[in-house]
Amino acid sequence: MPSTGTLVILFAIILILCIMLLFYYKTTEAGNPGVLPPPIPPPTPPPPKKKYDHNEYMEKTDLEPEVKKNHRKWANEAEHLISSSVKGLENLDETAFLANHKGHGFRTFEHAKSLFKEFLKKY
């Protein structure tokens, strides 16, 4: 006759096998053979970005009517002033520039030109 410890171990093994068999049949009945989780769906792509429409933007803003009407003209005038400033800076005499801008923090004429061009690139 086997000892009590051996009987307990055999009973535990049989019990575990029964539970595993029961679990297997429950998963096959549900249509999921095995225990794999369902596959993860692929991520949905983001919606396409809407192209910027300046006229639509101006309609939505709460600017004054005069600003809405004239902003294009003012932008063109500002662009013309900036471009003429660049041309003026390129044609400016170095000695006249240094005489007019002493103590303004410019090391040389080329330094001032480079700073101004960097400023124009930013804005």
UniProtKB/Swiss-Prot annotation:
It is a single-pass membrane protein. The chain crosses the membrane at residues 5-25. Induction: Expressed in the late phase of the viral replicative cycle. The keyword Acetylation does not apply. Keywords: Host membrane, Late protein, Membrane, Transmembrane, Transmembrane helix, Virion. GO terms for cellular component: host cell membrane; membrane; virion component. It is found in: Host membrane; Virion. Coiled coil: none annotated. Its main location: host cell. Belongs to the asfivirus CP123L family. This is Uncharacterized protein CP123L.
